[in-house]
Amino acid sequence: MDATKTTFKAGFEKLNKDIERFPHVFPITEDMHITYEGVSRLVMLDRYSYKDSTKETLSEGDLVILTVKEDPKYPARGTGTILSINLKDQTARIRVSAEYQHNIDDFEVEEGGIMTRRILTLDKPLELFYEQIAMRNAHGLAEVEITPELRHEAFLKFYEEQKALNFIPAGRVLYGAGSGTDVTYFNCYVMPFVPDSRGGISDHRKKVMEIMSRGGGVGSNGSTLRPRHTIVKGVNGRSSGSVSWMDDIAKLTHLVEQGGSRRGAQMIMLADWHPDIFEFIISKMQNPRILRYIIENFEDEQIRMLAKEKLHFKP
């Protein structure tokens, strides 16, 4: 027997059997070879590969994607192999791939880079080859054609161009096309100006959340919002300002996951003529040394006060 075929059968026969349960995923064939390496491979598997989201096929020996180091802002992702599954506790023991073991916290790992994780937190990619993703994309994009013949022709054209890397769709298309999920194919959305009212801000926030939940990034401009301390006549109060309202919208970024480790992306803007512009700029500063420099060297009392507020802020 051909040694290549023996290796193929040993490596992917089970996965192809699992794939039969997922009508949108194409099986691995012997002519597929594009897998990428390092970060490129992790991004492909984590963000674009079709997953068994219900874990119905998860078993020993499977390749999975997991968070190897927990962090509220910058969690480290990696790949690993399932060693055993505890159905009672809904956990799995995983040997983390060698290239990601350096990210693991020492207190979480056993000898040999073995970790225990809840099954719920694992992702099992079904598309290990770029050609599988290209086939799914081509099939999905060709569905708009009106006859079977035209659909087949479009499928072949899309697939050959994408496989040859002559045409690479945007990330949201790689993730969504042909997947049967109701996600967006657009990476970025530019929103209308935010209406200067509680109802208008709430509606804007709702739209941002909906776009992000379907995979899109959002740009919002808060220049239409009234400045900080402005009188709100209807309730005889004062506004907390454009920065506070836009910060609330920006926090959606940390709440909405978009598949794998990808979180929603936003660009929050404010015009340079807006009275809150200094507060806006300082709110984006992360380096304490810069804030201290501003406090110690700037003469403008408003700017110094804003820098002090930012430096001493504790969420």
Predicted regions and their residues:
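Extended catalytic cores of very large enzyme megasubunits
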Residues: M1-P315
